[in-house]
């Protein structure tokens, strides 16, 4: 069974009197920085000078420094910039300025797990990974709640790395909801596998193929959109709130029977075998290698795929349907 920590298992004491540098002030960086400050901790921000994020952080009362200057004065460094930007920033603006005994925190294990960032031996390397977007991290904190998170230790130079990870988790409100101990490998691999075979890749293609089948059979695209995409939220909300069995108890008997008899014939053992093939690509590092090479080429393949997604018929119909539902196009 997984080890789960709550508020009673964590303390802010390891962070008291220390300077925390949050590198990045995007959706996660801003939320975590604000929560940590509201928890009574000293937080500074490290950014490229002059950008919109710099001005926003200053306007919200933070001391803001260029990344290297923030790292040089920090005891705890939270690397909250996008994964693919991290290796270059690490090499040029973080690693040369780290203090011995510093604590380096990541919100995702990708660069550490796949060896794109190699920290020196004289620092702690930890991960605190909220399992929600930054907006929810902040909103739940302000409401007196929190979002769940994962914590992991990659390198324990101080002997207290887990305590630092739990302190950060407590400071951002995650221990209010529950924090699961994991490893960098497990977090990275399950995150990527889940995105590819279910949450982004699998779900997206399932919806698109269902839409295509209905339209090819002569049904109106607008009706098809509602049936396979719009109503997906209703089902996912039930699953999120009640679990899969609870969702089944929340739909009609006709939906139950149809879903339970037809679903396994579509998502069958052959699909499961394909899922495993692509999961193993993640585990072996093959996907990471492919993605790093793609990013180095300027993301040309990704741009083409995004354009194809943008122009799919479900998006053309969806733009009009979202205006009807929400009064404007939702990005």
From Swiss-Prot:
> Per UniProt, where does Mg(2+) 2 bind?
191, 227, 231
Q: How is the cofactor bound?
A: Binds 2 magnesium ions per subunit.
Q: Which GO terms describe its biological process?
A: isoleucine biosynthetic process; L-valine biosynthetic process
Cofactor dependence: Mg(2+)
Please give the superkingdom of this protein's source. Archaea
Supply the alphabetized keyword list.
Amino-acid biosynthesis, Branched-chain amino acid biosynthesis, Magnesium, Metal-binding, NADP, Oxidoreductase
Residues that bind NADP(+), according to the entry?
25-28, 48, 53, 83-86, 134
Positions bound to substrate: 252
The residue ranges of the KARI N-terminal Rossmann domain are 2-182
Q: Which Gene3D superfamilies match?
A: 6.10.240.10, NAD(P)-binding Rossmann-like Domain
- What EC numbers are recorded for this enzyme? 1.1.1.86
According to its UniProt record, in which pathway does this protein act?
A: Amino-acid biosynthesis; L-isoleucine biosynthesis; L-isoleucine from 2-oxobutanoate: step 2/4; Amino-acid biosynthesis; L-valine biosynthesis; L-valine from pyruvate: step 2/4
Which residue intervals define the domain KARI C-terminal knotted in the entry?
183-328
Q: GO molecular function terms here?
A: ketol-acid reductoisomerase activity; magnesium ion binding; NADP binding
- Residues noted as binding Mg(2+) 1 in the record, renumbered to the chain: 191, 195
What does UniProt list as catalytic?
Answer: 108
Q: Which Pfam families match?
A: KARI_C, KARI_N
Q: Does the keyword Cell inner membrane apply?
A: no
Q: Name the reaction it catalyses.
A: (2R)-2,3-dihydroxy-3-methylbutanoate + NADP(+) = (2S)-2-acetolactate + NADPH + H(+); (2R,3R)-2,3-dihydroxy-3-methylpentanoate + NADP(+) = (S)-2-ethyl-2-hydroxy-3-oxobutanoate + NADPH + H(+)
Q: Which family does it belong to?
A: Belongs to the ketol-acid reductoisomerase family.
The entry's function note states:
Involved in the biosynthesis of branched-chain amino acids (BCAA). Catalyzes an alkyl-migration followed by a ketol-acid reduction of (S)-2-acetolactate (S2AL) to yield (R)-2,3-dihydroxy-isovalerate. In the isomerase reaction, S2AL is rearranged via a Mg-dependent methyl migration to produce 3-hydroxy-3-methyl-2-ketobutyrate (HMKB). In the reductase reaction, this 2-ketoacid undergoes a metal-dependent reduction by NADPH to yield (R)-2,3-dihydroxy-isovalerate.
- Tell me the protein's name: Ketol-acid reductoisomerase (NADP(+))
């Amino acid at each position: 069974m997984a080890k789960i920590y709550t508020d009673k298992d964590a303390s802010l004491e390891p962070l008291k009197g220390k300077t925390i540098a949050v590198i990045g002030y995007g959706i996660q960086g801003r939320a975590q920085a604000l929560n940590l400050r509201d928890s009574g901790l000293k937080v500074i921000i490290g950014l490229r000078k002059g950008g919109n994020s710099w001005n926003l952080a200053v306007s919200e009362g933070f001391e803001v420094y260029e990344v290297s200057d923030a790292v040089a004065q920090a005891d705890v460094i939270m690397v909250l910039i996008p994964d693919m930007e991290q290796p270059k920033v690490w090499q040029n603006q973080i690693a040369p300025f780290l203090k011995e005994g510093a604590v380096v925190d990541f919100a995702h294990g990708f660069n550490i797990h796949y060896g794109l960032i190699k920290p020196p031996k004289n620092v702690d390397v930890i991960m605190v990974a909220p399992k929600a977007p930054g907006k929810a991290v902040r909103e739940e904190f302000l409401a007196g709640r929190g979002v769940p998170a994962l914590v992991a230790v990659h390198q324990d130079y101080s002997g207290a790395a887990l305590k630092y990870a739990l302190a950060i988790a407590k400071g951002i409100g995650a221990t209010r909801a529950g924090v699961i101990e994991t490893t960098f490998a497990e977090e990275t691999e399950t995150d990527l596998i889940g995105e590819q075979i279910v949450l982004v890749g699998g779900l997206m293609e399932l919806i698109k193929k269902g839409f295509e089948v209905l339209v090819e059979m002569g049904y109106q695209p607008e009706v098809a959109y509602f049936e396979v995409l719009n109503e997906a939220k209703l089902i996912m909300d039930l699953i999120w709130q009640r679990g899969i069995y609870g969702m089944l108890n929340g739909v009609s008997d006709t939906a139950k029977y149809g879903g339970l008899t037809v679903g396994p014939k579509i998502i069958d053992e052959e699909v499961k075998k394909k899922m495993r093939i692509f999961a193993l690509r993640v585990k072996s590092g093959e996907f990471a290698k492919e993605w790093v090479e793609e990013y180095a080429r300027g993301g040309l393949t990704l741009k083409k795929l995004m354009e194809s997604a943008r122009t799919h018929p479900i998006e053309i119909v969806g733009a009009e349907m979202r205006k009807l539902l929400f009064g404007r196009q939702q990005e």
